[in-house]
């Protein structure tokens, strides 16, 4: 991990090519029960997506990391983490989901990123929209949705932040409404540290 952090330091201070290589190098980062499926240096530009679609939002240059966390055999927690290419404020913000979750609002990561945060979101451990048929016969997925996906996303994201940016966030925040409010309370009550 030290060599990756050294490469990151060179990448941030020397040239965009090094930053791109450091970002892409995250795909080889060893994580506990998680895999980084994609790590891409993204130039400044418009992003769209998420549940509501909506007008494009301009996001600053960043390293977009996607991954899957599997703490149990039946778990499949998708997450996305955006790390600013420059101007990191030293803080982490995780976004909550609404309703039954089931997707990642990647475009929602643009706003905290513009303010210098490393920002992450998760699908809460399942892919799908309204309804909870995904939980039938899958008690581990229900636990993932209940609290584990949010916590695991936070842990894995902070490990990736340390690897790429060379230090842990000084503060962590959670932003959400609807189910995101419940997620924030579960995280604060179960893991107050």
Feature map (PLM): residue ranges:
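Catalytic-loop region of hydrolases
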Residues: 18-91, 106-107
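Surface-exposed patches in mature extracellular/periplasmic domains of secreted proteins
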Residues: 38, 162-174
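Mature extracellular/periplasmic domains of secretome proteins
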Residues: 82, 109-113, 186-189
């Amino acid at each position: 991990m030290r060599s990756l952090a050294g490469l990151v330091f060179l990448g941030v201070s020397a040239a965009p090519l090094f930053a791109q290589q450091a970002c892409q190098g995250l795909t080889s980062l060893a994580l506990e029960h998680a895999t980084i499926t994609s790590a891409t240096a993204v130039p400044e530009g418009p992003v769209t997506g998420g549940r509501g679609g909506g007008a494009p939002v301009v996001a600053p240059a960043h390293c977009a990391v996607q991954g899957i966390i599997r703490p149990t055999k039946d778990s499949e927690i998708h997450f996305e983490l955006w790390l600013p290419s420059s101007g990191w404020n030293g803080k982490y913000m995780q976004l909550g989901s609404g309703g039954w979750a089931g997707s990642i609002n990647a475009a929602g990561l643009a706003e905290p990123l513009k303010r210098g945060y490393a920002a992450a979101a998760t699908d809460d451990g399942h892919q799908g929209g309204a309804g909870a048929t995904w939980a039938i016969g899958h008690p581990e997925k229900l636990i993932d949705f209940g609290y584990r996906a949010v916590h695991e996303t936070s842990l894995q994201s902070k490990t990736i932040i340390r690897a790429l940016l060379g230090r842990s966030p000084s503060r962590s925040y959670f932003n959400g409404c609807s189910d995101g409010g419940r997620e924030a309370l579960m995280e604060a009550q179960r893991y107050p540290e």
